[in-house]
């Protein structure tokens, strides 16, 4: 190129980074494209993982450590305050830190725990130079952060991070998960039984609580079996505890895997007390109706006591699991047909603790795929729409867009299913058929209303006159258009009698066995009912059906209401 520079040219855009950050902050405030929620003191902070990881080394380690973190959408932390996290979030997205005398101590403490050195240096400088001097800045105001409150928060922060960094799957050999329920070879059954037997012995000896997969001991140190033989150990189930160390090590292990919500979100994953552990085990235990047949087998077994699956401890489940393993290894004549399914249930129960999942529910038809229901909010009316793909259809009700057009009469519709129903008017298609009389209908609700002629069902009733109707629009017309005189109709009205002689004299009274004819205002009321409600319609076979306004129609054929002259006094 003549007179130009040969080669690539780098053109800087100084405002590009600030524009990107501004766009991300706008997405955060509107809740768009946020892939993680930080829960602090009951407040939710939707945000982006990449932004937090780029700003905080603690969040970077939290989001990138362990395989279980790939499924994590919600993190609940209790070692920082909501006000401090709000200020740090604004700093991460706007590059501006807003501090005051009241919150500088909390922000400094949170910045140290979340490893944001720039904020820590600024807050420390403000306190040392007494630019923001407070009467009582608390433990966070100490330059070295050695206050008791900071030490407790630091311990909780390390404990929370350690839970996600120590993946129990990594400490177990692959053979530990080759159970019979997961397509393991038959020759591994003996090894599996020995491993579970050692686990049961450890539980019985009190060496572990049945769910302690997070002990501080290395994988090589394993507890001895119940027979006391040295060197005989359980391969990779419960690591040995140090007798001098406190229970659970430096960071007490979680009592149960973090519970998930409907959308796959996780709750708080911290240590809990013994009472909370019992509650967690009770909630995680399978329901009696969903549990396999091992409960009935336990009632018929050696103990003879009925087992209550609610609140079962892990040791009890392990012992019942061993019983199932023993039955699976016996001959086919002695083993029960559902032992294999029982074994699958136990193995899924305990493997769920390794994988960080909730305890699987019993299902004899196999595992079911759980699909998270999509919830979307309408930007116009803020109505929450449930179901993927339904939001555009809802928005058309606001915009008036009708993309689906009938190619015959050019009528347009907002929904394709409405167009499909409309086309039946042109094609004459009537897919809904009455099984009793053979009448065909184009709409499902027409068939539903027609079936009430056979069943006598009249679900819609006037509160004033107690008159009943087959269809809701008939009741609406009775109340709004024609008006209701408020005179209660006689219960069931007069029975309809087929073949009433036409020569019954007027004023001779009703035929024998019938109640007296209506008098005074009731006669006019019944006449209005007949004028308002009775509608004749031809069914698919050309027969005439007349729906009366009161009483139950007799099943078994069309009936015609008696005329006014039959009931005249």
From Swiss-Prot:
| The BTB domain, residue ranges | 34-101
Region (Mediates interaction with KHDRBS1) spans which residues?
A: 275-569
Q: In which broad location class does this protein mainly occur, judging by the first location in its UniProt entry?
A: nucleus
Query: What is the annotated tissue distribution of the protein whose record heads this document?
Result: Expressed in osteoclasts and kidney cells.
Q: Which residues form a coiled coil?
A: none
Q: What function is annotated for this protein?
A: Transcription factor that represses the transcription of a wide range of genes involved in cell proliferation and differentiation. Directly and specifically binds to the consensus sequence 5'-[GA][CA]GACCCCCCCCC-3' and represses transcription both by regulating the organization of chromatin and through the direct recruitment of transcription factors to gene regulatory regions. Negatively regulates SMAD4 transcriptional activity in the TGF-beta signaling pathway through these two mechanisms.
State the name under which the record lists this protein: Zinc finger and BTB domain-containing protein 7A
Native source organism of the sequence:
Rattus norvegicus (Rat)
Q: Which gene encodes it?
A: Zbtb7a
